Amino acid sequence: MFHRERQLIDGERISIIPNILSADECQQLIARAEESGFKLSPPSGGGHGRTHREDPRTNEYTVINDQSLADKLFKRVSPLLPPTLEWMADNAYFTKGIGGREWSIVGCVDRLRFYKYKKDEEYPEHMDGSYSRTITYNNELQQSYKQHSFLTLLIYLNDDFQGGETKFFPDKQHCRFLRDIENKQPVHVIKPKQGMALINIHNILHEGSKVQSGIKYVLRTDILYQKITELHPKLEKYSQKNSNNNDKIIVTEWEKHFEPSCKMYHD
């Protein structure tokens, strides 16, 4: 049993937790991802013009939907994470005057993304996309919640390679133009270590640096927070129709959200 502590790199915005996974667990996940089959990552893009760039993202990826693994990861990291988002600056998802206090930590996205970087592969500057959905619990209260991810959970599955650091860059009000982020020096550099978790807010500019030798494997999911919400009448009908004695009813599928002012986004 590992003793786990979270180390703050930039307040709550960036932190690391060593030994979230053991070496054996990491190797098992690499094998599972390889068995699932990697494919070339799609081009990434963003910006107000929504133009895609074909050149920067050269890694491979695979997606495994696994609620039990997502729950396992959440059980390990959640005791070390903020229970609410009170610390986070107000944004479009917060009610004015309340901030993040109405959001409480609830789980990890079950859409687990595995990424594989070979020699000379990288992922230049980008911001992370987020996920959201609406659920309702099939109990006496029939309470509905809006779930939204605000934090990225990235786990390094190996460290027997050179390069591949995660670098964070200075804040920029907008990164609409390429010149806004070129030639920036990183303010934080995270060296990969097997089994270590990196947690960061989605809307912070960072990169996965070029792998110099070897192969780099990482696992990404997202930390979900939820708040009470009122269902649209059409969703209420869906909820009633699909109750079927389940503990919870997924009212909407996962929706992806990307920072519109950033030239790069990351799923």
PLM segments and residue spans:
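Fe(II)/2-oxoglutarate oxygenase catalytic core
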Residues: 1-197, 203-267
